[in-house]
Amino acid sequence: MLQRARLWPPIFTSRCAPFPFSRSISIPYRRMAGVPSTYDAPVHIAVIGGTGISSLPGFELAATLDVDTPWGKPSSPISILQHNSPTTGKPVPVAFLSRHGLHHEHAPHEVKNQANIAALRHIGVRTIIAFSAVGSLQEEVRPRDFVVPDQIIDRTKGIRPFTFFEKGMVGHVGFGDPFDKSLAEIVRKCGHSLEGEGVRLHDKGLLICMEGPQFSTRAESNLYRTWGGSVINMSALPEAKLAREAEISYQMICMATDYDCWRGDGSEDVNVEMVMAHMKANAENARRFVGAVLNELTKEEHGELVLAKHIEGQMRFAGAMTKKEGRGQDAEKKLQWLFPGYFD
């Protein structure tokens, strides 16, 4: 069974501040002999993608981490890769996590979102670039176009665990702008630098996140169009909400692979073959786009943004609403693990 946001093409470099390397490595499906299982330095940037992430020119594999969290293990081991910063020349680590598992074993409602975000924060991540294949809900968003969404409508059904604050620890966080505006600007800058070479980028868009794993009915697809929906997937939530609770800057990059099922007489309805064909055809553009964003983020000038200083500490107050005597012991321990020093 496949679903949008499940398979993402291998990531390579781009011409937007190109990498000074040509060698590529493959992210392993099992631990490679001699690869460390620990990494001592904090890792501030992460990529969450599908099982298709398989090679990254310019990166060297530094470690493969099996992280345990109070919410269980994440969807996959975390691969730590390094490349030299284009401004300082120093090695910069980037974490990679496969949303649906190394073998694509987690359906959208089974993705271990809490463990994924908790594990990334625990190793130091404060910026996440997420990737998703999407269906287009508008004529102008063509298959193979990229979209940097700025809003989400939640059409999941409460099946997926969607908060860290529950069972005796209440916390509320703002989600008016579900994606980080400053991070989005960097993503757009890199995308526009590639336009004219097969890349078409839409700066904004309303993303509908549905439950899945089935695709939409025609009535649903047309309803979402009347709401102003631009694209639709099954992966943005609760991932983005949990990232906000974890004080992590988050932006998703979407690649359209189909027109869902609203267009024409039904002969163009989304199917797995259609999705895979467009992803394969657009793989090189996706690699270049992703590589450009990562290379830009590792520049020294973006240090404050990458550390998410603009949202640091927001949960210290928002998550401390429950008085000490009313807190669930297990819930408090979990949050103390996620936010050391916040709720002591």
Curated annotation (Swiss-Prot):
Q: Where in the cell is it found?
A: Cytoplasm; Nucleus
CDD domains (alphabetical): MTAP_SsMTAPII_like_MTIP
The yes or no answer to whether the keyword Cell wall biogenesis/degradation is present is no
Q: Main EC class of this protein?
A: transferase
MF terms from GO for this chain are: mRNA binding; S-methyl-5-thioadenosine phosphorylase activity
Q: Which Pfam families match?
A: PNP_UDP_1 (PF01048)
Q: How does it assemble?
A: Homotrimer.
User: Which PANTHER family would you find in this protein's record?
Assistant: S-METHYL-5'-THIOADENOSINE PHOSPHORYLASE
UniProt family annotation: Belongs to the PNP/MTAP phosphorylase family. MTAP subfamily.
What protein name does the entry list? Answer: S-methyl-5'-thioadenosine phosphorylase
